[in-house]
């Protein structure tokens, strides 16, 4: 049996793609509630039949800005998850997050039942190519151990699956494995993702827009985002533009600029481009790797 961890929509896409590409019939998905509509998405994942079991997990993803309240909630939910998975045994577990805390929660849960479990990473965008996962503040390891978790610091990784392994030059643990590219001609993949994220070609909000603004989710550093977008919005045709909020946003931060805002917050851009031709469209973003 294999376990996959899904948080933001892109990680769910990766898990679905990986299972279909490898024809697995023994995979479970653990989907963490980190975005609006997660419950509905989880149910639609079940309906596709891609996974043997799909479990909805209370939020254990610590996001910025980090607060004491968030830390307490994450640890509390993590403890409940450990209790609920006590009798589940897996041979392999696939992670696709850069956070030590969330990965340590799943690592602790699954490694206690099988000490020889294979730990594997699926890349999570450009961050996998530019950041050393094992490079974290020393106190984080201490805190994770203090709350009774085994620290998933990367040293126990067996494999890292990447779409472009030739671009990986960062320090890492585990063998690098090339992932099968996503293919819009793969009918099963496209139909599954369209259903999961409630995509319907006849109601596509981006088809008649030439400019797509991709908003960014919460970051651990500050920058003049308002000033950046103010300059951009002065130089574009607003009637030909649409804003795509980040899946973790509750509301768009650009909502009062007279520009149409996409209503399907949870629709990942990767699903959109599997269905339409974006060659002649202009994408504007600050950090979003989906544009690449």
Cite the ranges covered by each PLM segment.
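Short boundary motifs at domain starts and secondary-structure transition points
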Residues: 19-21, 82-86, 196-207, 275
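Glycine-rich phosphate-binding "P-loop"
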Residues: 1-4, 63-70, 213-220, 250-265
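Donor nucleotide-activated moiety binding/catalytic core segment of transferases
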Residues: 247-292
């Amino acid at each position: 049996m294999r376990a996959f961890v899904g948080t933001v929509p892109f990680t769910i896409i990766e898990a679905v793609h990986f299972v279909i590409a490898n024809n697995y019939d023994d995979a479970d998905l653990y989907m963490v509630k980190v975005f609006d509509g997660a419950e509905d998405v989880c149910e639609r994942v079940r309906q596709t039949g891609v996974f043997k079991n799909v479990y909805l997990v209370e939020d254990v993803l610590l996001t910025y800005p980090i607060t004491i309240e968030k830390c307490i909630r994450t640890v509390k939910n993590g403890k409940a998850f450990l209790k609920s998975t006590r009798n589940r045994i897996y041979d392999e577990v696939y992670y696709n997050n850069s956070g030590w805390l969330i990965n340590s929660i799943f690592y602790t849960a699954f490694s206690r039942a099988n000490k020889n479990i294979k730990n594997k990473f699926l890349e999570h965008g450009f961050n996998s190519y530019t950041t050393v996962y094992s490079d974290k503040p020393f106190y984080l390891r201490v805190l994770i151990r203090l709350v009774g978790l085994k620290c998933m610091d990367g040293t126990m990784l067996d494999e890292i699956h990447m779409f472009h392994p030739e671009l990986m030059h960062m320090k890492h643990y585990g063998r690098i494995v090339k992932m099968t590219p996503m293919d819009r001609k793969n009918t099963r993949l496209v139909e599954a993702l369209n259903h999961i994220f409630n995509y319907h070609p006849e109601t596509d909000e981006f088809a008649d827009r030439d400019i797509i603004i991709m908003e960014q989710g919460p970051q651990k550093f500050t920058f003049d985002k308002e000033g950046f977008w103010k300059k951009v919005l002065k130089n574009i045709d607003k009637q030909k533009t649409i804003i795509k909020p980040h899946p973790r946003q509750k509301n768009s931060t650009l909502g009062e600029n007279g520009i149409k805002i996409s209503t399907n917050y949870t629709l990942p851009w990767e699903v959109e481009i599997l269905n339409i031709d974006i060659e002649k469209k202009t994408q504007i973003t600050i950090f979003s790797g989906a544009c690449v």
